[in-house]
Amino acid sequence: MWLLVGLALWWCLAPVRAWGVSTSASAAVLMDADTGQVLYDHNGSRRMLIASTTKIMTALVVLERASPGEEVTVRQEHMTEGSSMYLKPGERVTVEELLYGLLLCSGNDAAAALADYCGGTASFVRRMNGLARELGMEDTSFANPSGLDDDGHYSTARDMARLAVYAAGNHTFARLCSTRSVTVGGRTMTNHNRLLRTVPGCIGMKTGYTRAAGRTLVSAAERDGRRLVAVTLQDGNDWADHAALYDWGFAQETRQETAALNREDTP
């Protein structure tokens, strides 16, 4: 009897084996945002570079420390390498505009300006790591607010899925990252996340890329009141892989519910 109980508990807590679905990613996780159950896991605990998906954490720390309407003065030192929202030294922009530039354009200049405004970069990065610990992201370390490659900057697909679940529950963050296009302060910004236009129920999240990290993608989708989050790291086929994971994952939930109902109906 106890063996049967143990096996039943193991089945409930273990990741669902992804028969019929696969990805091109070096690491991938699909997680149920409502229950925390891992539905699919491929190298989910492997520490890897995460590129600009870092900016999910950056945005969350900003939302802790500043209000969207506050104004930030851009400085020369905020001009950094990589993707940009094309800020100019001396201009004044709101925190909300910078958050759009961070999440839609993946602006490293926006990340630098926000971190500097919210207590300075060193303090800001400490809070990024502090929040990571609070969320149980034990295999994660942040070294900067933008996601540029650094030996001390890494995470795992599982940890990023935990972060995505937390982020999806923040209404302001969810509104910002699911915006397809916006014009604020004379700038028109278009979301890099193609899934918003191609995957039913997608509520966005964050793309990323560096030569060393490859393509990284964190996303969330909601269908029929259920919400899933997907993470792929080092995946050249990430758009298609996320679409396939969601189609499989939402169908998997339906199959499990149907099986449960069938068991209840069995005399």
Predicted features by range, described:
Residues A14-R158, V165-G169:
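Active-site-adjacent loops and short helices of periplasmic peptidoglycan-processing enzymes
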Residues W2-C12:
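Bacterial N-terminal signal peptides
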Residues M137-E138, D149-P267:
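Domain-terminus/edge residues, biased toward the C-terminal soluble/receptor-binding domains
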Residues L7-A8, V16, D139, G236:
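Intrinsically disordered regions, especially transient/low-confidence alpha-helical propensity segments
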Residues W2, D32, I56, D265-P267:
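Catalytic-site microenvironment of enzymes
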